[in-house]
Amino acid sequence: GLSVEINNTDAEGRLILADCLTYVGKYKPSHVIDMATLTGAVVIALGRHASGVMANDQNLANMIIESGEESGDRAWQLPLWDEHQSCTKTKYADLANIGGGREAGTIHAAAFLSKFTNDYKWAHIDIAATASYSTPVKAGTGRPVPLISELLLSKRLN
């Protein structure tokens, strides 16, 4: 496994997801999509009108975005470029759980997760901006259930 330096204890969700992404690999999946209210930074990037998508496979990202458009549960792709991978570097472990600085927080979280997805096509959907209403009443939106339902029922993944 990989060793992880904990630079921020508030970035614990990505550690749980990393364990899940590692564990699921033993089942040799063709595709894995994880969803989480992972970063507040996605609210800054996209507002509350779309979930953020990052993927190691462009076709999978496209299928998610298309399913979001068709279901009305929009998602928007953020880049996961090689340059973003450097945010996980540290001298004390294989990876750091959070990148330095304020920029690209959502992307840096996905860059960390991507280190655990080498054996399958993977996408992360950050639903921190879309999972709940803040006004007029605090409540869950049910998102991304419409997007995922459309993706599965459309058989795009086959």
Name the predicted role of every residue range:
Residues 1-158:
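A generic structural signal for tightly packed, nonpolar segments enriched in small/aliphatic residues
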